[in-house]
Design a protein with these regions (language model features):
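Bacterial N-terminal signal peptides
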Residues: 2-12
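Generic alpha-helix initiation/capping and coil-helix boundary signal
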Residues: 2-4, 45, 102
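Short glycine-rich His-centered loop
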Residues: 44-65
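Active-site-proximal helix/loop segments of hydrolytic enzymes
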Residues: 23-32, 36-38, 70-240
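N-terminal hydrophobic or amphipathic helices/low-complexity stretches enriched
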Residues: 34-48
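Cleavable N-terminal signal peptides
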Residues: 7, 17-18
Length: 240
C-alpha cells in the first residue's frame, strides 16, 4: 500500500469503491487480519452475510431459550446454502460462535467487494421482518471516504436493494416493516447494505403458517425469500 493510503487508513479513511471501474479498498488490515480476509474475484457477483453478535455477545433472548446469535448464524448458514446452489459466491463475517468486532465486520464486507450486504438480526418484538437502511444522507462517490460514513455513497443503491427484499418477502406472505436508522456496521459498509431483523410474524399467527422464531419452517421461508430477492438483484442490477 502506498504511504499516503496507509496514513489515510490510520486516520479512519479508505479509498472508496463507489463508481469505480476497478475498485480498490485502501484500508490496511494487520498481517494477521489480511490472512483471514477472503480473496474474491472481482468479476463474480458476491453477497456478504453478517450474522450479528457471537461469542460472549448473545444478542437478544428469543423464545425457548434461543439466542439471537444462534438464530442469525443458522439463518446465515441456510441462506448461504441457497445462494451457493444458484452459483452466487457468499462471504460471511462469521461461521461459528465467535465474537467479531463491528469494524472487522465492515472490513470484511469492504474487502470482499460485495454487490449486496445483509446484516442479519432477530428479535421477539415487532412482527415479521424489519428492514433497516442507513439513515445517512446520500453522497456523491469520492475517491476517499470516511470509514464511519462510507455507506453514504451507497445509500441510493441500498434503498433499491431494500425494495427488492421487501417485494420478495411480501410475495412470500411475510409482513415487512421499512425503516432507516444509524447502525455502525452498515454505515461503514461500502456496498449496497441492509440490516434484516426477523421477528415472529404475528400477522400470520391466525393462519396455517409457521411464524415463530424457533420454527425451522419459518426460518426456511425467510431464507428462501431473501435468496429470491438476491437472485433477482443479481439478474436485474448486476447480471453476470
Amino acid at each position: 500500500m502506498p504511504w499516503a493510503l496507509a496514513v489515510l487508513a490510520a486516520a479512519g479513511w479508505f479509498e472508496s469503491t463507489a463508481g469505480a471501474q476497478t475498485p480498490q479498498i485502501g484500508l490496511a488490515p494487520t498481517a494477521q487480519q489480511a490472512a483471514q480476509i477472503p480473496v474474491v474475484p472481482q468479476a463474480r457477483f458476491v453477497v456478504l452475510l453478517d450474522a450479528a453478535h457471537g461469542g460472549s455477545d448473545a444478542g437478544a433472548s428469543l423464545a425457548n431459550g434461543q439466542t439471537e446469535k444462534s438464530f442469525t448464524l443458522a439463518l446465515s448458514v441456510r441462506l448461504r446454502s441457497l445462494l451457493a446452489a444458484r452459483g452466487i459466491q457468499v462471504v460471511t463475517t462469521r461461521e461459528s460462535d465467535a465474537a467479531v468486532d463491528p469494524n472487522r465486520r465492515a472490513e470484511i464486507a469492504n474487502h470482499a467487494l460485495a454487490q449486496a450486504c445483509l446484516s442479519l438480526h432477530a428479535s421477539e418484538s415487532g412482527s415479521g421482518v424489519h428492514l433497516f437502511a442507513s439513515s445517512l444522507s446520500p453522497a456523491q462517490p469520492a475517491r476517499f471516504a470516511a470509514w464511519k460514513t462510507a455507506q453514504a455513497a451507497w445509500v441510493t443503491r441500498s434503498l433499491a436493494l431494500t425494495g427488492a427484499i421487501n417485494a420478495a418477502l411480501q410475495q412470500a406472505g411475510i409482513h415487512v416493516t421499512l425503516s432507516r436508522t444509524s447502525l455502525p456496521v452498515v454505515d461503514s459498509m461500502a456496498c449496497p447494505a441492509v440490516a434484516v431483523e426477523i421477528a415472529p410474524d404475528h400477522a400470520a399467527a391466525s393462519q396455517t403458517v409457521h411464524s415463530d422464531l424457533d420454527d425451522p419452517e419459518y426460518l426456511t421461508r425467510v431464507a428462501e425469500a431473501l435468496a429470491a430477492a438476491l437472485i433477482e438483484w443479481r439478474t436485474e442490477a448486476h447480471p453476470l
